[in-house]
Curated annotation (Swiss-Prot):
GO MF term list: asparaginyl-tRNA synthase (glutamine-hydrolyzing) activity; ATP binding; glutaminyl-tRNA synthase (glutamine-hydrolyzing) activity
Function: Allows the formation of correctly charged Asn-tRNA(Asn) or Gln-tRNA(Gln) through the transamidation of misacylated Asp-tRNA(Asn) or Glu-tRNA(Gln) in organisms which lack either or both of asparaginyl-tRNA or glutaminyl-tRNA synthetases. The reaction takes place in the presence of glutamine and ATP through an activated phospho-Asp-tRNA(Asn) or phospho-Glu-tRNA(Gln).
Organism: Paraburkholderia phytofirmans (strain DSM 17436 / LMG 22146 / PsJN) (Burkholderia phytofirmans)
Protein name: Aspartyl/glutamyl-tRNA(Asn/Gln) amidotransferase subunit B
Keyword DNA damage attached: no
Biological process annotations from GO: glutaminyl-tRNAGln biosynthesis via transamidation; translation
Gene3D superfamilies linked: 1.10.10.410, GatB domain, N-terminal subdomain
Signal sequence segment: none
This protein's UniProt keywords: ATP-binding, Ligase, Nucleotide-binding, Protein biosynthesis
Annotated catalysed reactions: L-glutamyl-tRNA(Gln) + L-glutamine + ATP + H2O = L-glutaminyl-tRNA(Gln) + L-glutamate + ADP + phosphate + H(+); L-aspartyl-tRNA(Asn) + L-glutamine + ATP + H2O = L-asparaginyl-tRNA(Asn) + L-glutamate + ADP + phosphate + 2 H(+)
EC annotation from Swiss-Prot or TrEMBL: 6.3.5.-
Assembly with partners or alone: Heterotrimer of A, B and C subunits.
A Pfam family of this chain: GatB_N
The protein's enzyme class: ligase
Length: 491
């Protein structure tokens, strides 16, 4: 019998904090500036310069700690992480090691169903080890210099919050669900813009495998700088296969840092993985301990908005949504606000229908055109009226989709756009029993073979007759009434 393997994953996520200036200097942090135009003497580590802590970076770390139910350390220490790299001008990185600013905490994730693997959607709590403040390094530029490497120090000193999980995730799907939930949280709080293409939110995945039932962890490999959810999933899936095949072929997994090549969809070795002692951490003598008192924490807490998890719980309890649906609808503040605006008009009784429309037709159209919910040309009031017309029987769901696209394409600004289009195009649903009976009689007369097959026990024939009735009315017949009248006439 083949050995069964368990996957063990921990993530380290670097969230660039959305401050106007760097963590230890007053230099701007704007992305895309010309190389080395946003690098001050402090960032360049020129002699005689001293770092000064950015209060805004600390407050963003406090917000995050409060949001995940962590302990915000009353006293934390900055340390020097010593290593050589051309884009690290000081020869060390200012980080936190022994006492981080945020300790513990947890994030609840919703893992989607996987029909191919026969797995249902489920909820899981991922515990965090810590989150600490540190400065980013510069950037090495290889493309524009033949045989040479250019150094851009604009990014050096940009504030980061490194968020570290316990090694508790057991699949690539769980890791992606966690990363997406974390991304939603930091953007919701406004502490990070979450732009993965610009490197504002990037993940390192620590991956190992072990035989099922074994308590001891296997040797891990760290995959660096994964800046998309797809790359994160593909990199973990490849690395798991690589390690299992290596072990089963008699080899040994080496502790190392690896990079993911998205073109080849594989990881490759970058360097041997360092341990903490290799960095020779010691307290930074230029920075006093960071002291955060209870009053400061309370001030930050008072300014925070309702968190996604609280809104999710409210959506489940008030509107009867599933935890997964509630999670999708709180993927951004704009999405949650749009949904609540629709529900406020259609009422809690139609909250599930509103959720289905937002996650289905609306999201599909947004994805097709590469738009965010905030750029949706169909307002919440317009969608609400459309859903009300489905609820009161004026139109069918199928016709509603046509009207939605019409509102979208004409970029209508009037709240009553749905009613206007229904009237102009004559799209009102046919609910008159007499009219429907006449149409159904014609359909039955024109399709004797389907009638015979249905009476012989073939259910598909009944669906075919419904389809013919809907076709005869150009989709305007009330489907429920058609179903009922057909059954009555065929009984």
């Amino acid at each position: 019998m083949a050995k069964q393997w368990e996957v063990v994953i921990g993530l380290e996520t670097h969230a660039q904090l959305s401050t106007q200036s760097k963590i230890f200097s007053g230099t701007a942090t704007q992305f895309g500036a010309a190389p080395n135009t946003q690098a001050s003497p402090v960032d360049l580590a020129l002699p005689g310069t001293l770092p000064v802590m950015n209060r805004g970076a600390v407050e963003r770390a406090i917000q995050f700690g409060l949001a995940i139910g962590a302990t915000v350390a009353p006293r934390s220490i900055f340390a020097r992480k010593n290593y050589f790299y051309p884009d690290l001008p000081k020869g060390y990185q200012i980080s936190q090691y022994e006492i981080p600013v945020v300790q513990g905490g947890q994030v609840t994730i919703q893992v989607p169903a996987n029909e191919k693997a026969g797995k249902e959607a489920y909820e899981k709590v991922v515990n965090l080890t810590r989150a600490h403040l540190e400065e980013d390094a510069g950037k090495s530029l290889h493309e524009d210099f033949a045989g040479m490497t250019g150094i851009d120090l604009n990014r050096a000193g940009t504030p980061l919050l490194e968020i570290v999980t316990e090694p508790e995730m057991r699949s690539a799907a769980e890791a992606v669900a966690y990363a997406k939930t974390l991304h939603t949280l930091v953007t919701w709080l406004g502490i990070c813009d979450g732009n993965m293409q610009e490197g504002s939110f990037r993940c390192d995945a620590n991956v190992s495998v072990r035989p099922v039932g074994q308590a001891e962890f296997g040797t891990r490999a760290e995959i660096k700088n994964l800046n998309s959810f797809r790359f994160l999933e593909e990199a973990i899936q490849y690395e798991v296969r690589r390690q299992i095949e290596l072990i089963e072929d008699g080899g040994t997994v080496v502790q190392e840092t690896r990079l993911y090549d998205p073109d080849k969809r594989e990881t490759r070795s970058m360097r041997s993985k360092e341990d903490a002692h290799d960095y020779r951490y010691f307290p930074d003598p230029d920075l006093m301990p960071l002291v955060i008192d209870a009053a400061w924490i309370e001030r930050v807490k008072a300014e925070m908005t309702e968190l996604p998890v609280a809104i999710q719980q409210r959506f489940v309890s008030q509107y009867g949504l599933t935890p997964y649906d509630a999670n999708v609808l709180t993927s951004s503040k704009a999405m949650a606000a749009y949904y609540e605006a629709v529900v406020s008009k259609v009422g809690p009784a139609n909250a599930k229908v509103a959720a289905n429309w937002l996650m289905g037709e609306v999201s599909s159209q947004l994805n097709r055109e590469g738009l965010d919910i905030a750029e949706n040309p169909v307002s919440s009031a317009q969608l609400a009226l459309l859903l009300q017309r489905i609820a009161d029987g004026t139109i069918s769901n199928k016709i509603a989709k046509e009207i939605f696209l019409a509102i979208w394409e004409e970029k209508a600004t009037d709240e009553s756009a749905a009613d206007r289009i229904i009237e102009a195009k004559g799209l009102k649903q046919i609910s008159d029993t007499g009219a429907l009976e006449a149409i159904i009689d014609e359909v039955l007369a024109a399709n004797p073979k389907s009638v015979e097959e249905f009476r012989a026990g073939k259910e598909k024939a009944f669906n075919a007759l419904i389809g013919q009735a809907m076709k005869a009315t150009k989709g305007k017949a009330n489907p429920a009434q058609v179903n009922e009248l057909l059954k009555k006439k065929l009984s």
